[in-house]
Amino acid sequence: MIRRLAEGRTVRSVGVEEELLIVESGTGRPRALASAVIRAAGPGAEEPGSGELCADERSAGELDAVQPLEFELQKQQLEIDTRPCYSLDELSRELRRCRATAAVAAARAGVTVAALGTSPVAVHPEVVPTSRYQAMAEAFGLTAQEQLTCGCHVHVGISSAEEGVAVLDRIQPWLATLLALSANSPFWQGVDSAYASFRYQAWGRWPCSGPTYQFGSVEVYQATVQQMIDTETLLDSGMVYFDARLSQHYPTVEVRIADVCQHAEDAVLIAALIRGLVETEARNWQAGRSDPPARTEQLRLARWRASRSGLDDVLINPVTFRPDKAVAVTGLLVEHVRDALADAGDTLLVADLLDAVLHRGNGAAAQRSEYQRRGRLVDVITAAAATTTS
């Protein structure tokens, strides 16, 4: 998962998992047609019960043989997974290919897909009938039954679990900025939630989600996970929904904080910044450098603020933990990972992609703008579906 280039540099793999809503073209109403869409994708697609594990729970040998489309918790959504990539151009092509595959399969089933963090219109989610998902619905009640949310998960290659835990410990203050950039879920059950990312608020209902304090070692990380399992509150270790965690089967760090982005290039930006963070903090660990750990309470407040405001108001500065302008906070993140971006050849593209988001706005801004312009939530969904595959 770390490739050595001819000139002696190394570059980390990066892969993206995205969850997409399945919606009716005319009304924007989410449709419980995951099975039909996934069947329409053709050979290699999962069937309910045969693919109960989430993407990062497949065996390492299946890393490059990803399924075209996969089930998620609810019948009104599906998941797409890119292959591991080593350049942002490659990742962009792969992500667009995956989105196009989902759109074509959805069209065959008489629906479409939309990269939206939550459904703008009212919906009654239907849990996919696998034993694991049904057990989750029974154990967690409305938390599971209402959990129709779509996120973007980024996997970045690491050299060892020790390096991975060191990275997890060091990236925590920076993750709220990624949430603000990706925020794409202002509407919930037909009303404006007043949040840029209400998905993050809904996701926070799980007992094991959110930020983590520094672990300090692989042993402590593993012991913490086991202690959580031992409470018999979670079904299994796959329900350890930290905002960033070690993948169970891949040699990667998985950052799970972002909303799914309407624009594919925004997802590429998020992935590039996460890869830059992983590389930067791995270097800091190797050099014996570390900042004083942020309190989990501070991290939670910073992420709440990012969820509430997105890019439209102040964020929490990850260095001072004081309010600061969103453009200043995003600039701090880019400066923090500057050397890693340069070494990966990502500097110019990241600058262009970030400039586009700051000028255009994130997905939440796009949804509210469309609703203000047209006055109908169905138009919000139609516009998002068009952007998803543009």
Give the positions of each predicted feature.
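C-terminal accessory/tail domains of diverse enzymes
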Residues: 1-105, 109, 125, 203-390
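Metal-dependent DNA replication initiation modules
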Residues: 116, 120-122, 131, 136-152, ...
